[in-house]
Amino acid sequence: MYHNSTQKKHWTFLSEDEPLRRRIQANVRYRARIRATEKPRLSEIFSLEPHEELAICKYYEKRLLDFCNAFKPTMPKSVLGTACMYFKRFYLNNSVMEHHPRIIMLTCVFLACKVDEFNVSSIQFVGNLGENPLGQEKILEQILEYELLLIQQLNFHLIVHNPYRPFEGFLIDVKTRYPMLENPEVLRKSADEFLNRVALTDACLLFAPSVIALTAILSTASRAGLNMESYLTECLSLKDNQETMSHLLDGMRRLKILVSKYEPARPEEVAALKKRLDHCHSTEVTLSVHGRKRKGYEDDGYISKKPKTEEDEWTDEDFGDSL
């Protein structure tokens, strides 16, 4: 249950400022390590500010969703939600300058497939990237290198409660106990679109899955000219519990505001930032910072393989047409 979960205890925050604060701290920590290297000036030229890191993350979150939606065989929504949550959690405490979101994104999806028991082989997985066999092998090698780090940085909290299951539950409940809405299925398409927009925001770090699911249904109904507030008072028995009702409505209001004010990263901005990010990950800069522990904790015994040379690295274009 969500209310007893590690998600609620460790990964759900009371304020929108908390995820922002953690991202800034991750950026500051990494830039401090850059300044301590032999080439601080060279490294600082290409360093990213916190808001620039956020733009990069937004770009790769969208690519993550596109990859999952285009995946063959069809990927369950729960896997998409879990992967997106992993990605957001990882970059609360890590900088994109240290761990490139291109590979972290794929590692999040790969791990989510396992945790949510979506049975695809590693060959099937990388086959969705539109790469040649040699390229697929290189990408899979990197995914497997990063998998342990990802699990560590998630504090081994791998179970994610997504809004998709409660959404289906509420929809069934509306069908059986709310005759005022003749055909609740008419809400599904718009509600799915709302949940896709929610996935790009920090909502999963701020709201319970049930609140997100209920907001998807009621806001979709509202846009269709349907008032379902009586569903809350009658079917959910909140008529005599004004405090809970008020708290729920306030949460739904804040969630809708969060979704409405979301702004995707601008393509021209991302293009420039990606060039600087690639410089951050160039051999001359990264080796002096990370050494042998490039992909692991600084204080544990996990030693990664030697970083790939520049000619071995793969780019966003290696995703092919799958996105």
Swiss-Prot record:
Residues 310-323 have a biased composition (Acidic residues). Keywords: Cell cycle, Cyclin, Nucleus, Phosphoprotein, Transcription, Transcription regulation. One of its GO terms (molecular function) is cyclin-dependent protein serine/threonine kinase regulator activity. Its main location: nucleus. One of its GO terms (cellular component) is transcription factor TFIIK complex. GO terms for biological process: regulation of transcription by RNA polymerase II; transcription initiation at RNA polymerase II promoter. Residues 296-323 are annotated as: Disordered. Gene3D superfamilies: Cyclin-like. Belongs to the cyclin family. Cyclin C subfamily. Associates primarily with CDK7 and MAT1 to form the CAK complex. CAK can further associate with the core-TFIIH to form the TFIIH basal transcription factor. This is Cyclin-H. The gene is ccnh.
